[in-house]
């Protein structure tokens, strides 16, 4: 195991050496140990020690405390905690590890590179098993968010929950409602960034968590959409769509999971239902404390999936579409392609998509206007022309944009001023 310690950042080893030299015990713990064993890079390096915080402060006067549930001492970005047990500090590494969430996260490495594994974490890691440490019912009750974390780690390992751990989550699944919504948001976005998103989502489904975390997705189970070639249910369709998107776009994956009630093939004649679904998603994400920009992005994605490729038959149609697209073009292309894959689209549909991609990218390269801010005139120009401000300004500028979308060369100040004056006089007539 000595090779493991060679992968630890030098600044972390220096802290461990200083604590050891002062007579203290110190260990690397948690996710960084798990990542070392998996031969993966780690972002966070956490230490535990038997030294009280007063001694840590004497050793590292530049450090500072933080943390709500218990104090954590941070030095140069490295977190150092004192051994903690049930409800208080402890003098035992084993007791500290006993109250961590999963066996795969309850291992430690000392400065000599020796692995301390009291609960079989290494074996579980090798077998891709997610198991609560010791009594699963106790671990869950210490922090109900651990249930969602358990499903995330199932996806992280492409593994499975240990049987008793799975039973504990099902038993307490309703309690996920008391977890702070901000924490659920963080866990959900981490889950969306997994390479094996499917295993994590299916774990939520089997554990009765999905109905509380993503209720609209849960309700899509066994709902068949006859317009799909394979007649798959909306739950599987949504999951397949999300899986087909790169893991580096977690928010786009989330939008794909939540688009299920508004695919154009199923709902083009049900505008009321589409609107209701969008509002349900808005309410869900607002409750989870998603930011305004995140919320807008997800809603925009859902709404933009609700159209037919065949509705964009001309270059002007494509320009209009780009003018109303409130998300990066490449993200839209990614999610729409994923949607087609999940729908088992026909060869003709994929050919139409490929043509649309080429046309949209070519149009995007045009030195043209796609929004009001791109026009060579604005409300200030209209005022200088002697026009009286009012709702008519919006109508005039919208008409100017439509003119430019049809003829990009018309985005010229002199022409647009002349065109705007004509529209203004027509309005007053």
Which residues are covered by each model-predicted region?
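Catalytic cores of the polymerase beta-like nucleotidyltransferase superfamily
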Residues: 1-429
